[in-house]
Amino acid sequence: MSLLDVLANQHAAMMPEEYKHRSVDEMEQRVVDIKRAFGSKLFIPGHHYQKDEVIQFADATGDSLQLAQIAADNKEAEYIVFCGVHFMAETADMLSKKNQKVLLPDMRAGCSMADMANMKQTDRAWEQLTDLFGETILPLTYVNSTADIKAFVGKHGGATVTSSNAKKMLEWALTQKERILFLPDQHLGRNTAFDLGISLEEMAVWDQIEERLITDQPLSRIKMILWKGHCSVHEKFTVRNIEETRKRDRDIQILVHPECTHEVVTASDLAGSTKFIIDTIKEAPAGSKWAIGTEMNLVKRIINQHPDKQIESLNPDMCPCLTMNRIDLPHLLWSLESIEKGDPVGFIQVNEDTTKDALLALNKMLIIK
């Protein structure tokens, strides 16, 4: 179920106005007090893209799958307050124990890319693509997708992928079927396939709005069918950003996330997952120069953590992920105080049938080495 469906089908509680008028010091102290009172019964995972005002209270930081797995490994927590976006909280719920409750501090914290693939579109695409290609297609989905899409992929024998293991998972998938349908991020799919030696001519794009396959090649040549989705943040980095940065400083290295366009990834010095970006900067020598193409909150945090290196955003006009930024200190406190009062808000629960099929896709990824 997409975030839009959630908000359409249930009344999403809105944070009371009073939280907007409380002082930062008061709110921070209340969060500290509640965390201390609940102890190990409360667990707060925080995604790398969260604001510092939220991350400072995270019990663990990481990417979406890392955090879901960490939360699932936590046997003591009764409440998991997931500081991320909707699909991440869904994954945490599916991997957690039945007695654990997963909460999202703001139900409006969605992901535009995840919502670019809904079930109606995906069912329709599968029907038309199997008419064209028969039983030669295996679906893969980026973990940045809704529980429904993960369930669809699991039901059809596919698996989930992360930006860290996408290459390994695509290699596996191509041993299973001749062609891959990659959802919902066309750029990660294209960059990964190209890295494996699949030419751009062997890739087609499925336009879910116009319901058509975009290619000028014979269908027999197509190995990758890329869903026409993208990350609204990473698509804003351009080759012009790279050219201007290098013109200003020839010694600077360009490091980007593979959710960027193929042209940007190809023009960069290095591309990799969020963990890869963090580790690369951590291991880089003092005095080295870097322009990073990823979400601004993370870039700012990396800059603050490494004052011995010259680090900047590849696009100085880049804004943070707007939906991720819906989770802020007031919403976090509101969520925690609702638990304290015994009436939790922002409860995330994926139904059993969807969970069963989605776990097929998730677990397949986890066991493939």
Swiss-Prot record:
Known EC number(s)? Answer: 2.5.1.72
Q: Name one Pfam family in it.
A: NadA
Tell me one GO molecular function of this protein: 4 iron, 4 sulfur cluster binding
One Gene Ontology cellular component: cytosol
Q: What's the name of the protein?
A: Quinolinate synthase
Q: Which organism is it from?
A: Bacillus pumilus (strain SAFR-032)
Q: Which SUPFAM superfamilies match?
A: NadA-like
Instruction: Name the cofactor(s) required for activity, per the record.
Output: [4Fe-4S] cluster
Q: Which gene encodes it?
A: nadA
The record's free-text note on cofactor binding? Binds 1 [4Fe-4S] cluster per subunit.
Q: Is Iron-sulfur there in the keyword field? A: yes
Tell me which residues bind iminosuccinate: 47, 64, 142-144, 163, 257-259, 274
Q: Which GO terms describe its biological process?
A: 'de novo' NAD biosynthetic process from L-aspartate
Instruction: Tell me the keywords, alphabetical order.
Output: 4Fe-4S, Cytoplasm, Iron, Iron-sulfur, Metal-binding, Pyridine nucleotide biosynthesis, Transferase
What InterPro entries does the database record attribute to this sequence? NadA, NadA_sf, Quinolinate_synth_A_type3
